[in-house]
Each structure stands twice: as C-alpha cells, then as structure tokens.
C-alpha cells in the first residue's frame, strides 16, 4: 500500500492540530490519528455521544489525497456518525483551514459542522462497526505490547483480514471478530473456510482473534443471556485471550 506524500502529511498534521485547538485541555477523543493505510477517513474522533469522520480536501486541488469520499461515507454511515470534509489551503508554505470554527463541513449537506452543537443526552447503542474497530484496537495494542511491528489495520466489519503484522518468519494476518456478551456464542464465521482459502493465496501465516465486549454494568456470566446493551461513550469490559494460530486453516 502506497505511503502518503510528505506534503499531505504536513497538511494532515495541521488539520489535526486545528481540531485539538477547539477544546480546552488535552484532546483525548481521537479514534483515528495516524497515517497508516488503508484510508476510509483521514481523522476521526468521538465527542460526547457523537462520532465524526473527516476527509481532508485541498481547495486548490493540488494535493495528492489518499482514500475517497465513498470510503468516508461508508464508515460514517456504518458507525452512525457524521461524514465531514475539512477544506485546507496552503498559504505562504503553511496549511490552514478554510471553513470557520472547527473547520468542518458536512459531506452530505455542505453546511458548517460544530460538533458541540450535535452532542445530546441520548443513549446511542454502539454499532457493529464501532465494536469491530474497538476490537481491532484491543488486538493491535496487545501485539504492540508483545513487541510486534504492525504493518496495517482497519476496523471495517465487512473486510478481512483486520490486521497485518511482522511475525517471526515474515508477514502475518489476523482475522478479528467481536461479540456482544450474552447475545451470540463466539464462533468462527460461517464462511471461515472461504476467508482462509482466499488469504492462503498471500503465502503468509494466519491468526484468528475473538474479542468479547460487555457493558460496565454487566458481568461475564457464561450462563447469562440478558446482557446489558453497549452504549457509546460508557466504556466496555473486554475478554480477549490472544491469537489462535491457524495451523490447519480449513479444519
């Protein structure tokens, strides 16, 4: 996967700093704040009970920009979040936001977006996309703790594998599945053989990871079937037992 250009990286950094400057104190709400491909969005964050996904634009159309508007809309719609464009302009060698305030405009309506105005007290149940993205974060942080070098990762529940990393003998892939505690018994997907058969064509070793999520108001009761719903911004209890090596993938 192609690396981003230095010019885009500089623009991206300026956009991120602008977002951080909109809040008092340290900004701790980033969902995506890295330049590792693939790119559905360039930046994303949670504020209150709302999610915001950002695609950077160059108003002069001279910047080589990774990803697409289609990708932005897919992750925003899949997560029940807001798809935002962030127009940027290079002036005297420095990148600046064109739109006022947060610098965001709706990708669907073209109106200015102020994230603070969209926060509410509504309890919003986490989408499958949010949970998958969270599960991938759990697995990759565990890999990094074990000293593994990550190559790429993505949080879409509709794409496999979720993670590539450098193993002891070369690149390895990880298929990640997340489960809501008490709703579905964890198991490999029904099309598991097809997934693995396809990934075997890469010639790389494979792994499988299950992440089970429960509400902070819930407990991991193996016999329970009345698990509490998972609401955005309320935290999660997690059960993750590590990678399962796929030594005989089609069995």
Language-model segments: residues:
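Domain-level recognition of nuclease-like catalytic cores that cleave nucleotide substrates
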Residues: 90-114, 206-251
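Repeat-unit-sized solenoid/scaffold elements
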Residues: 119, 130, 163, 177-179, ...
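Beta-rich nucleic-acid/ligand-interaction surfaces
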Residues: 158-164
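Catalytic cores of nucleic-acid endonucleases
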Residues: 32-93, 168-172, 176-228
């Amino acid at each position: 996967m192609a690396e981003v250009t230095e010019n885009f990286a500089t623009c991206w950094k300026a956009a991120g700093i602008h977002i951080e400057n909109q809040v008092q104190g340290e900004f701790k709400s980033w969902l995506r704040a890295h330049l590792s491909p693939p790119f559905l969005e360039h930046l994303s964050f949670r504020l209150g009970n709302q999610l915001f996904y950002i695609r950077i634009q160059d108003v002069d159309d001279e910047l080589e920009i990774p990803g697409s508007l289609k990708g932005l809309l897919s992750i925003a719609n899949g997560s029940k979040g807001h798809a935002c464009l962030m127009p940027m302009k290079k002036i005297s060698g420095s990148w600046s936001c064109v739109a006022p305030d947060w610098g965001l405009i709706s990708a669907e309506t073209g109106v200015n977006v102020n994230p603070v105005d969209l926060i509410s007290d509504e309890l919003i149940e986490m989408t499958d996309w949010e949970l998958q993205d969270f599960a991938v974060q759990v697995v990759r942080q565990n890999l990094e703790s074990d000293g593994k070098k990550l190559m790429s990762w993505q949080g879409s529940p509709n794409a496999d594998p979720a993670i590539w990393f450098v193993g002891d003998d070369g690149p390895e892939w990880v298929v990640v599945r997340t489960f809501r505690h008490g709703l579905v018994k964890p198991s490999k997907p029904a099309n598991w053989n097809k997934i693995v058969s396809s990934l075997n064509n890469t010639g790389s070793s494979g792994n499988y990871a299950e992440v089970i999520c429960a509400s902070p108001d819930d407990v991991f009761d193996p016999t329970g079937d009345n698990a509490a719903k998972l609401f955005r911004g309320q935290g999660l209890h997690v059960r993750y037992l590590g990678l399962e090596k796929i030594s005989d993938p089609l069995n």
